[in-house]
């Protein structure tokens, strides 16, 4: 269904605010995940460690609300996701809520673990579409889920 002008106008009026919140929260989340020993890798262009950081900085005012990260070997991706209290498991993007999904269980599921590994998709890779929740609440949720 296509949005009517009546439905689309309120969404467009708050778009800049939502993108600003999503981007700032995503950067904060990427930083705390990158600093955690239980996280193997974080993929977010707002991090100086990202190979495309300089390009993203030249092109964009903000880095967006989408990031992904890998848990260290031996950590159960699904157990981690089940410990999240604020983030919602879902495959869509761009919601006002933070959405998470294990990447291996999206469109790549039918490829099998060997093919995914050859493409650089770890079984513990989690995609996060950051919403507009309070940033500190979001950071707390992702931190507490890392606890065994």
Language-model segments: residues:
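Ser/Thr-centric signal marking residues that sit
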Residues: 2, 14, 98
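Short, small-residue-biased leader/transition segments that mark boundaries at the very start
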Residues: 2-9
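Ligand-binding pocket scaffold of soluble enzyme catalytic domains
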Residues: 8, 19, 36
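Short, well-ordered beta-strand elements within core beta-sheets of diverse protein domains
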Residues: 10-17, 64-72, 127-131
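A non-catalytic, amphipathic alpha-helix used as a structural packing/dimerization or gating element
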Residues: 17, 21-28
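PLP-dependent enzyme catalytic core of the Aspartate aminotransferase-like
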Residues: 18, 75, 98-148
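Conserved small-domain helix->loop->beta segment predominantly found in fold-type I
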Residues: 27-91, 95, 111-117
């Amino acid at each position: 269904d296509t949005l009517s002008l009546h439905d689309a106008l309120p969404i467009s009026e708050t778009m800049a605010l939502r993108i600003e919140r999503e981007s700032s929260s995503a950067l904060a989340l990427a930083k705390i995940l990158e600093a955690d020993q239980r996280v193997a890798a974080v993929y977010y262009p707002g991090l100086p460690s990202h190979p495309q950081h300089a390009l993203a900085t030249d092109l964009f005012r903000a880095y967006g609300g989408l990031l992904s990260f890998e848990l260290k070997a031996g950590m159960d991706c699904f157990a981690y996701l089940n410990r999240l209290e604020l983030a919602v498991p879902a495959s869509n993007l761009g919601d006002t809520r933070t959405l998470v999904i294990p990447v291996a269980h999206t469109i790549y599921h039918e490829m099998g673990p060997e093919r995914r590994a050859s493409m650089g998709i770890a079984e513990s890779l989690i995609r996060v579409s950051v919403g507009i929740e309070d940033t500190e609440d979001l950071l707390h949720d992702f931190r507490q889920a890392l606890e065994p």
